[in-house]
UniProtKB/Swiss-Prot annotation:
Protein name: tRNA pseudouridine synthase B
Keyword terms: Isomerase, tRNA processing
Function in brief: Responsible for synthesis of pseudouridine from uracil-55 in the psi GC loop of transfer RNAs.
UniProt-listed InterPro entries: PsdUridine_synth_cat_dom_sf, PsdUridine_synth_N, tRNA_psdUridine_synth_TruB
Gene that produces this protein: truB
Gene source species: Chlorobium phaeovibrioides (strain DSM 265 / 1930)
One Pfam match: TruB_N
GO term, biological process aspect, one: mRNA pseudouridine synthesis
Assigned EC number: 5.4.99.25
Family, similarity comment: Belongs to the pseudouridine synthase TruB family. Type 1 subfamily.
Example of a GO MF term: tRNA pseudouridine(55) synthase activity
Amino acid sequence: MVEMHEGAGLPEDGEFLLLDKPLDWTSFDVVAKVRNAYKRGGLKRKVGHSGTLDPKATGLLILATGKKTRELSTLEGLDKVYDAVIRLGARTLSHDSESEEYGLRDVTHLDEGAVKRAASELEGKRMQQAPMHSATWHKGKRLYELARKGTVVTDRKSKEIVVHSFDVLRVELPLAYCRIHVSKGAYIRVLADELGEALGVGGYLAGLRRIAIGSYQVESAMRVEDAVARVLGQMQVTDQ
C-alpha cells in the first residue's frame, strides 16, 4: 500500500508552477499530469491553469494548485510574448498547420525589408475577429464545432487587442521568424494570416512558442516530468 504524509515542502495553500508545455499536449493534459501526481500520494488537490495553449504550441503555461487557483484570474490580463514561425505563400482554413494548405503563391520576390514593413503595420491598437477554428462561443456552440460542419459565421465576435510589437527576427523564405508581444486574448494565427494578406501571398502560423506571460519567463519554467517529480518530492510517499 502507498502511504502519504504531507512534508514540510508541500505548500499548505498551494503554489504557482511555471511549466514548459510540450508539443502536441493540450493544456489540460499538463494539468491532469500534475493533478495525478497528487493523487498518487493520496492527496486530492485542485489544479488549474491560466492562458490556454493550442496543442501545436509549446512554451510557458502557468499552473496553480490548491487555494492559489483563486488567484489565476489575476494573470488573465497580463501581456503575452510569443516566438512565431509564419509560413508565407500559402493559407489554411485554421490559420495554422492543423489544416491543409491552399492558395499557394510564389514568394521569391519578397525580401526581409518587405516582411518587416508589413509586420510593423500590424502593430498598435486594433479590433481582431475570432477565427472560425477557435473555442469562441456563437449562439450556444463553439466556432470550431461549426467550422467542422462547413459553416462560416461572418458576424463573429471582435475584440480590441494591442500588438505592442511585431518584430521580424529573420526571413528564410518561405518562413518568417518573428517575436510578437500582444495584449490578452490576441490570436497569433490571425496575425499570421493578416501578415500574409498584407504581403499579397497569404500566410499561416507554422510554429508557436510562448516565452513570457507578464514578468513570468519560459526560462524559469520546468518540464512536465520535473514538475511531477517536484510534487512527489514535496510529499513523503512510502510503500507499506
